[in-house]
Amino acid sequence: GRFLALELSNIANLGAYLMPGGIISPTMHLGGLAGVYTTPAIYAEVSCVFSNTGSIGPYRGAGRPEASYIVERLIDNAAREMGIERAEIRRRNTIAADAMPYQTGLVFTYDCGEFEKNMDMAMHLADYGEFEARREDTQARGKLRGIGMANVTEQTSNNLGETVEIRIDSTGTATVIPGSSSHGQGHDTMYKILVSDRLGLDEDDIRVTQVDTDV
């Protein structure tokens, strides 16, 4: 039940003309083929072709979902063929938290991650252990029930830098002025935690000011 290698041959239909970002979907996913797993050797070959169909121009989120879909479907197929429970086969091949930093079989080096813990938490919240009982009950009522499983990694950013300024006044209060801004991810909370950890300040004494050109 150990993953030894992954080989991918991908033919991508770009449509009749090359649009901006058209090759993102078939190429940006390459590093993501490693997923959260210890697959030591990964080979990927991508061929982009033109056709008489509409051109491809992805807007958001393209590339990474394709990689996760490929890997997780392969794992499910392997689990069925080998008779190994699908959570167990994933567990046997998941990168351990104490193995970080971890160089994957293709492109990326992970600096941190508790992938098995994440999977266990999701299984607990989904009451995975009792799923078969729920399935049988559903089938008895003439309906079908299924459950999916996938471990997904997301490329969060590129390697471009960003600035942050920290001002500390005479009272010991810190004002953090980051170059990036929060739009739903809770950056302000994260900034306070980081500054508190590095400078030894209480989080109540840290103020985060975002998108204010007057400062």
What kind of region is each of these model predictions?
Residues R2-A67, Q139-V215:
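Gly/Pro-rich active-site capping loops and adjacent beta-alpha segments
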Residues Y37, Y69, A87, G113, ...:
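Active-site-proximal helix/loop capping residues that flank conserved catalytic or ligand/cofactor
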Residues T94-T173, I193:
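Helix-loop-helix junctions that connect adjacent transmembrane helices in secondary transporters/permeases
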Residues R2-M28, E81-D120:
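Molybdopterin (Moco) oxidoreductase catalytic core of the xanthine/aldehyde oxidoreductase family
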Residues S47, E72-N77, E81-R90, R198-T209:
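Long, well-ordered alpha-helical segments
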Residues R2, I56-E81, T104-D127, L199:
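Glycine-rich and small/hydrophobic secondary-structure elements
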